[in-house]
Amino acid sequence: YFLLANKVKKKNTNQEIKYLFKGHDLFFNSNHLYRNACDLWLNLIPNMMKKKIHYTENEMNNTEKKLEPIFIFGLPRSGTTLVETIISSGKIKVPNTGEASIIHNSLINLTNKKEIKENKDNILINFKILNETINYNYYELEALKNYTGTKFIDRTMVNFFFYEIIFKIFPNTKIIHCNRNYFHNLVAIYKQCLENLPWTHSIENIIKYIKLFDETISKIKLLHPKNILTVDLKELTNEPEKTSKLIMNFCDLEWSDDVLNFHTKKDLICSTASNIQIRNKIYKYDDNKFEKYKKYFSKYILKHNLLKI
């Protein structure tokens, strides 16, 4: 159905939407575990991270080198891969850990070992063990083995849920918030079959995830205004040199022409739906591309006030 939708998208938008709906419905209902995954990321994790976090054994480890990660926070199809590629294409080689899920996986592991305890209102974490575990797991990644620097990139999509823990462990964290018109983002996500993201197969679930993301970004901007930079996809594609200079300056990295010539690199690796786009030069953002979809999503726009989030 997704192939059929792609085939008719230029001539018959109505039929494209019908194919997309059938494709998403069929895929989502093909595995009962997808419902559990949706509940995890739309309800359980957000509710857990709203609780007050307390730390025991709150001393820092004695590692000589303090990592200064650059976390890229963004929804699918919001330019995260483009920003990641720009940063890693500069003169100074910044290791790229992709979507390694170190934070989330470490938290699961420590929860299973009873090093993280949770009740109705609070979370109790053994900070010393958490800190050592997360640092160790990062250094075990191939990209950071034998690395002598302090900066690296992590683009794991769900990291935004854990921003409090991230700042506790890495106080010098830099966050690049990739922003896109939320309606455009909704349509762009729905037009894809993102197999590893079960919440993307329902318009209502996509909107719920967008709201969770938006609320969290607002909190980070309030609590850590100097540690977060918002990069709008439209601005990045319309003024790539100006915006890429802002990105590199925020990351304390030197800008060069190489930053915008990433598509010529032979060692460019990407495992996301943006694989094809980043192998081409940056094209200007097309505002009119999604206008024809408004009538099909109008009830969701009105219900959730999506255009004003």
Q: Where are the language model's segments positioned?
A:
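Short gly/Ser/Thr-rich phosphate-binding loop of adenylate-forming enzymes
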Residues: F21, Y163-I166, E235
